[in-house]
Amino acid sequence: GVGYCDTAKMLTNWRSSEELGFLSEVSVVPLQQSLRHLQSAFSNFWKKTSRYPRFKSRKKSVLSLEYSRSGFRIKNGEVYLAKMKEPLDIVWSRECDINSASTITVKCDKAGRWFISLLCESRVEEKPITGKTVGIDLGVKDAVVLSDGKKLNPDRRAQKKNEERIKRGQKALARKQKDSKNWEKARLKLSRAYARYTDAKRDWLHKTTTYLVNTYDVLCIEDLNVSGMTRKVSGEGRSAKSGLNRSILSNNLSELRFMLEYKSQWYGKECVAIDRFFPSSQRCSECGYINQELTLNDRHWTCSECGTHHDRDINAAKNIKAAGLAVIACGDGARLES
């Protein structure tokens, strides 16, 4: 087969040819990195760990360049890329030891914003022990509900404004002739509205998950099946289900869990996922009675056995906490009884 060495030789010939001579105007390093990625993609395909590599359209793909250590230099705290006389004008999002960078990736997103990411070695220090355990119920009305009664939500008003900007942008784009100058202006404006929306959500997710791992040592969550929760239905109730699906997806439950898990691992905390079929909302956290008649519309309910009045989500979070502690006590292979 054709491997990286073969394609690297082809690249040398392409750069010296009349038809593809423009390739010599840029550094060879990101071109070589693209060939390495191509080889990795085909290797993964032959190993049956991924599907057949697809052609990446210049219009639809995110523009990116990857530089290995030979393709950039760092001088006086500034980054110079190969074939560039001036350093990059960078607004750093965080402090890092740029001198230890082994790879630099430059990207331009669909909103026309340029980003640079550096692969550096960094030692993550464990967070102080707090001795606290919390159950976390991830939901729709309230994004995050804790067993101690706290409810954490993004700024819904700002979120709604961003959604309205996107709707206006979609309507404006639909009125333009595709690929015209005005269409491109409208597309860029819509992309920036999407970027503002997703950036705000990601910022809230990072701040919320960082708060949780700073405050608690053990975090108990449900193993939610988001794809199953957002499955489409036909017939009666289709419109209501579509609205529910949008609300679930807008809270980014899967990404929130992913962040919780890797940050817990980083900072020496424990994140426990309980069985997705555990009836956390239906079970009374005081006596264990299961209310089979509870519906999604019931935000509060009173236990018919012990008389305790419950906030649906806080009660679920308390049950998740108890179930998580049981999993820790019995081992990962334990299965909780309903």
Language-model region placement:
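N-terminal structural subdomain of ketosynthase/condensing enzymes
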Residues: 1-10, 175, 179
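Positively charged, helix-rich recognition surfaces that bind polyanionic ligands
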Residues: 94-100, 109-338
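Acidic carboxylate diad motif detector
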Residues: 4-109, 240, 246
